[in-house]
């Protein structure tokens, strides 16, 4: 018996309502809940349509506003945690699903695959899917890089899409997350990082099911569209950097299929707009803060005041930069947040121009090997990462 949840904010009503109908008609789903950020056009559309969908499918459908549960910017975290609270306190269902509201390729298989994995005993089921080689740059350059550098011996950096909003969890896992103060506090985009980290830290068994058609959803323009998400996802990693992950988590993955051509050939962001953005919004204090970084990074970013530059930010320069950011970055400080954005942008542009342009397969191989090099570097450096006893480590072959 399962509850399906769609958190939403300013989505196209027709897309969300299609997904609600798909979920409500699924034989494994006993209730559908939409969690709105505010009472807007989408909220009212769901509110009007819910009774008809309930009658047609026999599945209760409802919509409610997210509660203010966290202490950071009100956002996705409050929405997902509101759903956890409802699930635990107002229902007796055994499982809860989360799906992003803007998915245009959502179908019953998303639910079926997750349910079947849960039937096999996994506590958390995550969906993963093919992405364009220049998409998911926060995932690759912030979250998975941070996991590899800080916890190289754990499963964290092996999880395909740790920021994915498509997942199923059993009731006991939902309770464990909701009772964790770190999770409830994270009211913003960092919630996905916290869900991933805490479940691995607590040894929850994880299965990743593959969605071959990919996650079709609304796209963004320049990297500037992702600035808030970038800042909040990095801040989430920074807040966890001294945590220890001492027990291995069982982690299995469904084997991926061939990547569709329309995904392999897609460009994930507007390169021209992003290049121009590097030269904007500079302050004297940002230039002063560059003194904390290595000489190539400092001089390279200073150049960006006059013209776009990014050749200096290769993967090793980014690793060194990442450690400086972990130590010195201050969430809520406008200059630090802008500098983080510029540094990350140069890394993404460097990767795009030196790796992604060589083709999809080459780029994917590079990204996985990059994480491997980061894990190895972290394991060798004294004081970096939090290794577990070798006898406890699971094979990742």
From Swiss-Prot:
pH dependence of this protein's activity: Optimum pH is between 5.5 and 7.
Q: Which cofactors does it use?
A: Mg(2+); Ca(2+); Mn(2+); Ni(2+)
Do the record's keywords include Transcription? no
Per the UniProt entry, the signal peptide is none
Q: Which reaction does it catalyse?
A: (R)-glycerate + GDP-alpha-D-mannose = (2R)-2-O-(alpha-D-mannosyl)-glycerate + GDP + H(+)
Q: Which InterPro entries match?
A: MGS_C, MGS_GT, Nucleotide-diphossugar_trans
Q: Keyword Magnesium: yes or no? A: yes
Documented effect of changing residue 76 to A = Results in a 3-fold increase in the catalytic efficiency coupled with a decrease in affinity binding for D-glycerate and GDP-Man of 15- and 3-fold, respectively
Free-text remark on how the cofactor is bound? Divalent cations such as magnesium, calcium and to a lesser extent manganese, nickel and cobalt.
Q: What do we know about this protein's activity with respect to temperature?
A: Optimum temperature is between 85 and 90 degrees Celsius. It is stable at high temperatures, however at 90 degrees Celsius the stability of the enzyme is only moderate and 50% of the activity is lost after 30 minutes incubation. At 65 degrees Celsius, the specific enzymatic activity is 5-fold lower than the maximum value.
Effect in UniProt of substituting residue 100 to A: Completely inactive
One GO MF annotation is: mannosylglycerate synthase activity
Which effect does the record note for changing residue 135 to A? Results in a extremely low affinity binding value for D-glycerate (5600-fold lower than wild-type) and displays a slight increase in the catalytic efficiency (2-fold) compared with wild-type enzyme
**Biological-process GO terms, alphabetical:** mannosylglycerate biosynthetic process
Description of how the protein assembles with itself and partners: Homotetramer. Dimer of dimers.
UniProt record similarity statement: Belongs to the glycosyltransferase 78 family.
Describe its function.
Answer: Involved in the biosynthesis of the stress protectant 2-O-alpha-D-mannosyl glycerate (MG) which is produced in response to growth at supraoptimal temperature and salinity, and protects several enzymes against inactivation by temperature, freeze-drying and osmotic stress. Catalyzes the condensation of alpha-GDP-D-mannose (GDP-Man) with D-glycerate to produce alpha-mannosyl-D-glycerate. It is specific for GDP-Man, but it can also use alpha-GDP-D-glucose (GDP-Glc), beta-GDP-D-fructose, alpha-UDP-D-mannose and alpha-UDP-D-glucose as sugar donors.
Q: What is this protein called?
A: Mannosylglycerate synthase
**Source organism per UniProt:** Rhodothermus marinus
